Amino acid sequence: LQIMVAMHTINQNSKIEDLNQINEKLKTCVPSLKNEEQLKLIEASTAMYQRFLKQDYTDKTARAFEAFGYAVLDQKQRDPKKVIQSQKKLFDQLSPRDQYLLQHEGQAYIELLYQGEGMFTYRRQPNYLVDVFSKALPADQKEFLSRMAKDNQDIFYNDGALAVSWKELTERALFWEKFIQKYPKSYFINDAKLLFNEYRYFIFFGLDNTPVSNEYAPNTWFDPDALQQIRFLSTQSQSSLAKPAQQFLKFIATPVDERNTQFKTDLIDENGQKKSTYQIVHEQLEQLLKFDSPWNTEVYRDCHIDAVCIDTN
């Protein structure tokens, strides 16, 4: 494919016009291709944007980019263009490539994304794959990309905390469960399963800074919204989440002493330190629910930045 050759020439010295040209060509040629070729082009387009947005920072330019990010955060609309105008001196300290990307932010689906914890990154806007490819794809692929683009407009977590509501988290888990049942042979099936497992885990365990509970025990604190969703799931008999929700509710009603005899957990960690209550309870719950933590993985596949999942090392 001629277009594939053109895509491979895009790198961190390419211009916005080069991307626009390729994207226009893709829109016209994708509908006439076999699905196998369409999927190869989706993959190639993701790699193309990664090369285009790749940065080689020195200490100095990295610090300047960080400072620029904070200036964007301080600005009411969080509009990089306004910061470029108002903080000329700061802008001049950026690397030439940063200056170029920021001046063209919003074009060719280039977006400056706030990732939380004071960190910014460039990304391809998740709507890209929907706009350029979606219309020509089979139903399962179309549905996958549309849902991902919708969910990933904003960040999913920020500073060890969920950035979405418990209700939204539950709704996402139920969506992917249905997707897996509806399209068991989908090209994206493994990523759909990954998303389902990830959301399922967070429903019951939360994140460090948005826990479901600290002690998961009778008469202790629970996040009321999280608990409400788990109670709701315990009644959804058509979902595989009903059983873990019922087990969870039984677990949190069981006195701690009784639980400690019921579950075999080491109270001392491998360094000979006494484990925290939080740690012990998490291990007991993992034993009970048999869920794997999304963090226990060699390569983390990020499903929250684009309309497809991307391996990060």
Annotate each PLM feature.
Residues A217-N313:
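Hydrophilic extracytoplasmic domains
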Residues L1-Y122:
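N-terminal Sec/ER secretory leader and immediately downstream segment
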Residues N11-S14, D18-Q21, E37, L41, ...:
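Extracytoplasmic/periplasmic, Sec-exported soluble proteins
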Residues M4, N23, A173-I180, I189, ...:
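Extracytoplasmic/secreted envelope proteins and their assembly/folding machinery
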Residues E24, P31, A47, E198-Y201, ...:
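Extended, non-membrane alpha-helical segments enriched in charged/polar residues
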Residues P96-Y216:
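Extended amphipathic alpha-helical interaction segments
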Residues S32-E36, Q55-T58, D131-A139, F179-D191, ...:
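Short solvent-exposed coil/turn linkers within tandem alpha-helical repeat scaffolds
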